Amino acid sequence: MSEAGTPEGPIKKKRPPVKEEDLKGARGTLAKNQDIKSKTYQVMRDYEQAGSAAPSVFSRNRTGTETVFEKPKEGPAKSVFG
């Protein structure tokens, strides 16, 4: 049972205000000395070092070797509705 002056449950504390200069300093040091371990970033960096643009998933220039499951089919795609 609680007494008249004490609230029940956890006490919520207010966050201290954040200064703008603290944010500017933090943004600069987020990934300063860390290598990015993303496979996408690694591929992009390799293509950049080779002097060419990385292939885009939105590009229509396909060679047919992008997937190991099936080769591209000749002709338009067939409809599943008839």
From Swiss-Prot:
Q: Which residues carry this modification: Phosphothreonine?
A: T6
Tell me a GO biological process for this protein.
glucose homeostasis
Q: Which UniProt keywords apply?
A: Chondrogenesis, Cytoplasm, Myogenesis, Nucleus, Phosphoprotein, Secreted
UniProt short sequence motif Nuclear localization signal, positions renumbered to this chain: 10-18
**Sites of Phosphoserine modification:** S2
UniProt-annotated location(s): Nucleus; Cytoplasm; Secreted, Extracellular space
Q: So which tissues is this one expressed in?
A: Expressed in vascular smooth muscle cells (at protein level). In the embryo, expressed in areas of active chondrogenesis including limb buds, branchial arches and tail bud. Also expressed in the embryo in somites, in the perichondrium of developing ribs and intercostal muscles, and in various dorsal skeletal muscles of the back including the neck trapezius muscles. Expressed in adult skeletal muscle. Transiently increased expression in the gastrocnemius muscle 1 day after hindlimb muscle reloading following 10 days of muscle unloading.
- Phenotype seen when the gene is deleted: In one study, knockout mice show no effect on glucose tolerance or muscle function with altered extracellular matrix composition. In another study, conditional knockdown in skeletal muscle results in increased glucose tolerance in 2-month old male mice with increased expression of Slc2a1/Glut1, Slc2a10/Glut10 and Mup1 and decreased expression of Ostn. This effect is no longer seen at 4 months and females do not show any difference.
Q: Where is this region: Disordered?
A: 1-35, 50-82
Instruction: Choose one Gene Ontology CC annotation of this protein and give it.
Output: cytoplasm
- Which Pfam family is an annotated match for this chain, by its short name? Mustang
Q: Does the entry feature the keyword Cytoplasm, yes or no?
A: yes
User: What is the documented function of this protein?
Assistant: Required for chondrocyte development and proliferation. Plays a role in myoblast differentiation and fusion. Modulates skeletal muscle extracellular matrix composition. Plays a role in skeletal muscle function. Plays a role in glucose homeostasis.
Hey, which family's this protein in? Belongs to the MUSTN1 family.
The protein here is known as: Musculoskeletal embryonic nuclear protein 1
Q: Which organism is it from?
A: Mus musculus (Mouse)
